[in-house]
């Protein structure tokens, strides 16, 4: 199976349109042993269309796409004020992201401050995202449309080396920045749940379309002005499995701390691998801690290993909660979210819930925040929690990351 464009992605280190994290390409043994919990089930419904992703497309076909605009290089040069340094809103191994302006109706470049703001991703010629991966991302976002996927407006390809992508502008940047950037304003509990629901909705949509995201992480969750979450960066996405196949085999690519243990160990990936990554992000939202924190020692260095003993015990959940919340969160809601994360992090992929079920649970949790009470069906989760002893846990081996120089700047 290939990625959304139809061939294997071999990427060493690629990052989100605004910021990224270190990737891993080494195999590791399996992670912490987790218990099996039951998550409430309901059907996932969305009125957004799911396009077929079975037929690979060439660049020539992309040029004829009715949903994407083929920008000229000069148009994007004008929109970004000649790619001026003070227009840079993000940088990574892939290249740079610039803030630009285009006319909302004609999509022609416009003066700064007029028209529609866009994010223009300009790939480095020697960057980590090759031409095929660029085509894969264009193809995926050109076919898949959902309120929780970042909108791809158009693209530009000039010669053999100049490649650009034009996205809708996400003024709040990435979730990673809000959680971990020094001096960032703390995210309130309600907003964290809102972000988790938006990301879960986008991931559930992809899984319904038989797409495995393969790179779910905080830096790939972008936020609009109202903190609505949208998934970005689809260069590693894979289609499948199809027919009687239960998984897709691929070269191990992902981000340290987020990749599911069975994927790192075997190269076999399923939608449940994305579910594991979602569990890691839930932990980040709960704790405000990095997945891998090199400033810490021992078990505290790895977020999953450190948090597991507390997730299933409602008397200990407070120990993992982000101190920046100042205790301003509902205890029962925190327990439910922790249990949901625990289920997603189950060592056995088959015992992890579907993203549609995770979404249903989080949506009901959001309703309880508005009504002020936890329903009986949701309470069953918190009462069925299981704790772990040190002997039951198996520490997650940490592979050496593929490091890159990263920085992120934002333009107001």
Curated annotation (Swiss-Prot):
The modification Phosphotyrosine is found at residues 167, 263. PANTHER family: OS01G0588500 PROTEIN-RELATED (PTHR45621). Residues 83-369 form the Protein kinase domain. Belongs to the protein kinase superfamily. Ser/Thr protein kinase family. It is found in: Cell membrane. This is Probable serine/threonine-protein kinase PBL4. The gene is PBL4. It is a lipid-anchor. May be involved in plant defense signaling. A lipid is attached at residue 2 (N-myristoyl glycine).
């Amino acid at each position: 199976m290939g990625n959304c464009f139809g061939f294997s992605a071999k990427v060493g280190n690629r990052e989100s349109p605004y910021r990224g994290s270190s990737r891993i390409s080494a195999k590791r043994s399996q992670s912490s042993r987790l218990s099996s919990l039951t998550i409430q089930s309901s059907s996932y419904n969305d009125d957004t269309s799911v396009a077929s992703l079975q037929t690979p497309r060439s660049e020539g076909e992309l040029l004829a796409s009715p949903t994407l605009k083929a920008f000229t290089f000069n148009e994007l040069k004008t929109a970004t004020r000649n790619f001026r340094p003070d227009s840079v809103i993000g940088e990574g191994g892939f290249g740079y992201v610039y803030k630009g302006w285009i006319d909302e109706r004609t999509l022609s470049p416009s003066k700064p401050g007029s028209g529609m703001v866009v994010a223009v991703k300009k790939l480095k010629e020697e960057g980590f995202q090759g031409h095929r991966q660029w085509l894969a991302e264009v193809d995926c976002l050109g076919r898949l449309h959902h309120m929780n996927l970042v909108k791809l407006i158009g693209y530009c390809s000039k010669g053999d080396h100049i490649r650009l992508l034009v996205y809708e502008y996400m003024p709040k940047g990435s979730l990673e920045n809000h959680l971990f950037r020094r001096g960032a304003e703390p995210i309130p509990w309600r907003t964290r749940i809102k972000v988790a629901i938006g990301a879960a909705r986008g991931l559930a949509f992809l899984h319904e379309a038989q797409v495995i995201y393969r790179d779910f992480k905080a830096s790939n969750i972008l936020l609009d002005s109202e903190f609505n979450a949208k998934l970005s960066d689809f260069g590693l996405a894979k289609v499948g499995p199809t027919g009687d196949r239960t998984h897709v085999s691929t070269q191990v690519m992902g981000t340290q701390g987020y990749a599911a243990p069975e994927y790192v160990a075997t190269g076999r990936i399923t939608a449940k691998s994305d579910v594991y990554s979602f569990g890691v992000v839930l932990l980040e939202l709960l704790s405000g801690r990095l997945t891998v924190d090199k400033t810490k020692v021992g078990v505290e260095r790895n977020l999953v290993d450190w948090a597991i003993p507390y997730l299933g015990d409602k008397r200990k959940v407070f120990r993992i909660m982000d101190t920046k919340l100042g205790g301003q969160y509902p205890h029962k809601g925190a327990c439910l979210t922790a249990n949901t994360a625990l289920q997603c992090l189950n060592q056995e992929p088959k015992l992890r819930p579907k993203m549609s079920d995770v979404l249903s649970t989080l949506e009901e949790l959001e309703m309880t925040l508005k009504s002020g009470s936890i329903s009986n069906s949701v309470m069953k989760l918190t009462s069925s929690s299981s704790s772990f002893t040190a002997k039951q846990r198996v520490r997650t081996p940490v592979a050496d990351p593929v490091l890159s120089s990263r920085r992120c700047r934002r333009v107001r």
